[in-house]
Amino acid sequence: MESYLNENFDVKAKHSSEEVLEKWRNLCGVVKNPKRRFRFTANLSKRYEAAAMRRTNQEKLRIAVLVSKAAFQFISGVSPSDYTVPEDVKAAGFEICADELGSIVESHDVKKLKFHGGVDGLAGKLKASPTDGLSTEAAQLSQRQELFGINKFAESEMRGFWVFVWEALQDMTLMILGVCAFVSLIVGIATEGWPKGSHDGLGIAASILLVVFVTATSDYRQSLQFRDLDKEKKKITVQVTRNGFRQKLSIYDLLPGDIVHLAIGDQVPADGLFLSGFSVVIDESSLTGESEPVMVNAQNPFLMSGTKVQDGSCKMMITTVGMRTQWGKLMATLTEGGDDETPLQVKLNGVATIIGKIGLFFAVVTFAVLVQGMFMRKLSTGTHWVWSGDEALELLEYFAIAVTIVVVAVPEGLPLAVTLSLAFAMKKMMNDKALVRHLAACETMGSATTICSDKTGTLTTNHMTVVKSCICMNVQDVANKGSSLQSEIPESAVKLLIQSIFNNTGGEVVVNKHGKTELLGTPTETAILELGLSLGGKFQEERKSYKVIKVEPFNSTKKRMGVVIELPEGGRMRAHTKGASEIVLAACDKVVNSSGEVVPLDEESIKYLNVTINEFANEALRTLCLAYMDIEGGFSPDDAIPASGFTCVGIVGIKDPVRPGVKESVELCRRAGITVRMVTGDNINTAKAIARECGILTDDGIAIEGPVFREKNQEELLELIPKIQVMARSSPMDKHTLVKQLRTTFDEVVAVTGDGTNDAPALHEADIGLAMGIAGTEVAKESADVIILDDNFSTIVTVAKWGRSVYINIQKFVQFQLTVNVVALVVNFSSACLTGSAPLTAVQLLWVNMIMDTLGALALATEPPNDELMKRLPVGRRGNFITNAMWRNILGQAVYQFIVIWILQAKGKAMFGLDGPDSTLMLNTLIFNCFVFCQVFNEISSREMEEIDVFKGILDNYVFVVVIGATVFFQIIIIEFLGTFASTTPLTITQWIFSIFIGFLGMPIAAGLKTIPV
């Protein structure tokens, strides 16, 4: 079976081709309810339709943008037609309406923008300040929202409970049974009268309704869970200035006139206009289909919702929100194609198909044998031409039994149990600070063999402080020095440092609404800004003193950032750079000495500074070098900042402590067979020191630098990669190469963390991409499969534990369900062949189906993870889903149950002294009761596939306890009180004890089976 499944039902967790997805669906036969079974799989036809629609819309948008841009270059003399402000807008105090605002950005209408007075003019008409933003007065915000709309897209309506009831009724076998129930009701009443003749028909109808409502309730609850998770995925916050104060705001609360701050990796949250910024490059491919990035500046100020900031940073003013934006219109035209199905869902569809075909064969044969037996009886009595109502009902019962065998034999619950388990796990993982974006990721994480983790913020706290410095060639402890540090540095050097720190930064020092000073920016930036403040610097004064000519933001390839400013005295230009110590120091040829003088950087000074860098790094400090140069001969914003000729001002050592619990988590991974590798852009000595502290770098492991790794050929990589535990000074492409090699060459299942825009390729390539929720950019999050909301490595280990739990829970459920399938099939088939009757009726089989399908999935697929899971080796990429241990347990239990039921069938009447007209009914009730209790105790045994102690932690899973309790309770009701509908009769106390004992006996047998090696 496994080889057939691997050949035909094997899909990748990510990036499966449409052909592969089509192939397995076409192989799925004997599907009782396609609507329900394939609800959580990608709708390929809608996906094709959506893709075609997207291409059409992108082409329209692309042409519109290009035509408008070209037209405005040539048509300079034409003025826009007069604009009349609508009365309701005028009454509210605004001078422009939403439609006019929308047309400006949508058409890139420069003429119309100029007509309204440019960006400042529009701000005035919107009653907004380009510096202070909107007023936070509730009445004004409400009025603005009423006139200009909210920043939300149209969503499909939530499907109600009755929709799921209707879907459950689409089951073909239940429809056939419904027809059987109706015919049985009519014939029964006609022959036996009311109410006696209605019992069989009403029994089947009631069973169908029970199955439908339990199924619908389960599906509806799942849909609510997915809805909640979908809302979590869409929660995006942006930095906004309102009332003159910077604050975080949900994108849903944005309004026209809001001032939004954007940086690399951010998604533009609504249509708007550029206010100020540097080197802003926008990726518009998601909207227009154009792969060429667009420069946005004062000349081309249009920013469109849904596009991504590829480089630079800026302030923008929102003009159009929600369904009025280009992105909103595009989203409204697209139909959701759905998430790709997970590998387990597909594999279990394969299992369901195989068993379904076997079940269909047995059902047909069983029906044929039962009918043949009936005809033989009638032939022997010579009544084959005469048919009574009772005989018609008997024939109908045979048909119902055959159909119900198909109901039981086609395990449609298998693939749906995966969804149930994943929904449960995803909801619980939210509480553990992990947001799963793609279903398959949760499942795949259970098979992970390698985690490639960032250092900063994941293994460390990301709370950074400058603790050491080497300024003007003097090493000093900065921590706890405060303002006294200023007096120990030459005044000229202090001025240079403050100038460098406050001008060459992506952060800001602001006063919040409570009147307190607040540092904004990345942890590295805020640590450096804190140093600038301790040196006596004043951020706003410093920024106003100099005109910024050019900014080159930090990126992980260059590993440095730069700025060119115009000095007030004489208009001279000065460049400042800051970044990785070795890289910036290599660009220096001069240094500021202890007297504050600029002197040539000789060999001795270089050696001293390199030793200092290594000493800082060996103390697990991140090191940054600050340098400057005076530019002679003028500088244009189009020029690149010089790459060399700088003067080194100083080196700072930043402490970023290791997170508590990381060392234990790394050790837990090692015991679980998961290799943890650190991939960082930091200095190799810093990386090694942190890696040793975390327990990642061992004596036999290798630490390597990205540039060295890049130079290796394939043969060298084959030997090197298994030993790599630390990669320092790595670029995003180094990370991508490492991940690709691990996956393709070494067949590892790789999880990768990332937070920056440049990490997107590695996150996309990995089996599981893990983006950081706090430090991560929107681009990184969009490329990821799981978002680690607290940026903590220990949370990644929790995700792995949940992934293993999902995988093993599904294995438990499959083992349990296949046992019921095998026994129910064999018992009814063999009984039909040998005795001419079936001991389990249609109503009874429907009840068994519910125990095994919906209730069984609820009980076994929602087991919470335990610590034992992380003591096993990972399944890896090639592991068999249905293991030898599972086959051993399935066949062992099936043989036991089959033997018990056959002994009862053959000797039951004699054993219990049953005689009289109701003896067969009594025996069949006893067989049914024993069969159900065998499933109840087998369900408990299935909690562990290898361990003998199956009661450990049973009370931690209240769902399991409730399901077992409910099953026993309803079984008592069915036997004792619903006999006329379920074809049962009340049992004696002795018979009840015997039934429970027979079921319980399966547990020691299951424990004994687990001792058999496989």
UniProtKB/Swiss-Prot annotation:
Reactions catalysed according to its record: Ca(2+)(in) + ATP + H2O = Ca(2+)(out) + ADP + phosphate + H(+)
Subcellular location: Endoplasmic reticulum membrane
Modified residues (N-acetylmethionine): M1
Keywords, ordered alphabetically: Acetylation, ATP-binding, Calcium, Calcium transport, Calmodulin-binding, Endoplasmic reticulum, Ion transport, Magnesium, Membrane, Metal-binding, Nucleotide-binding, Phosphoprotein, Translocase, Transmembrane, Transmembrane helix, Transport
A single cellular component GO annotation: endoplasmic reticulum membrane
One GO MF term: P-type calcium transporter activity
Region (Interaction with calmodulin): 20-31
Membrane topology value: Multi-pass membrane protein
Enzyme Commission number, as recorded: 7.2.2.10
Superkingdom, taxonomy of origin: Eukaryota
Domain statement: The N-terminus contains an autoinhibitory calmodulin-binding domain, which binds calmodulin in a calcium-dependent fashion.
Protein family according to the UniProt entry: Belongs to the cation transport ATPase (P-type) (TC 3.A.3) family. Type IIB subfamily.
Protein's UniProt name: Calcium-transporting ATPase 2, plasma membrane-type
Encoding gene (name): ACA2
